[in-house]
């Protein structure tokens, strides 16, 4: 497959997330919406589910965002990119959608180097893991988590290599 064919395929996938979601669901897969940037996608993947970013863009209509966000929220928050107004989004989802779906919150500690920060972080991930197990209906094993980490690390390495190569071809 040529590079241009790959780019064309990527453009279609990026422009049609609703279609991609429908394809996953048609395959019988559970899809978990994740807000950027700190969602533990590896845990979702290890559970056998698909992590799908809840993203937006400035060239998309965001009128439905007003159903979930206060009118004074900036479009950046409505489009689910990281900023101060993103912090309460999980609570907004919980209030608006909590009776329709499980909303899982993850608080990242500001200090992850002291013992108390590490303990807090470990407890937060354990809570997320337990919530995901409830959604997927089975235990997420340590082996599955390790395998998921390997998959994601390989993907990240490939993206870093792509950026390096793309930088050499700015023409």
Predicted regions and their residues:
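A charged, amphipathic alpha-helical module
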Residues: 1-30, 122, 126-171
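Short amphipathic alpha-helical segments, especially helix-boundary/capping motifs
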Residues: 14-19, 55, 102-106
């Amino acid at each position: 497959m040529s590079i241009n064919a790959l780019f064309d395929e990527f453009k279609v996938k990026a422009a049609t997330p609703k279609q991609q979601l429908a394809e996953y669901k048609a395959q019988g897969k559970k899809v978990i919406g994740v807000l950027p940037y700190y969602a533990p996608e590896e845990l979702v993947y290890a559970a056998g589910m698909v992590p799908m970013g809840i993203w937006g863009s400035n060239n998309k209509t965001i009128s439905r965002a007003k159903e979930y966000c206060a009118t004074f929220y900036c479009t950046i928050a409505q489009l689910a990119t990281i900023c101060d107004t993103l912090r309460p989004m999980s609570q907004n989802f919980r209030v608006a959608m909590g009776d329709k779906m499980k909303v899982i919150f993850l608080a990242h500690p500001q200090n992850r180097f002291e013992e108390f920060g590490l303990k807090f972080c470990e407890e937060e991930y354990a809570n997320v893991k337990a919530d995901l197990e409830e959604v997927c209906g089975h235990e997420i094993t340590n082996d599955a988590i390790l395998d998921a980490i390997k998959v994601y690390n390989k993907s990240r390495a490939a993206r870093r290599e792509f950026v390096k190569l793309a930088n050499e071809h700015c023409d």
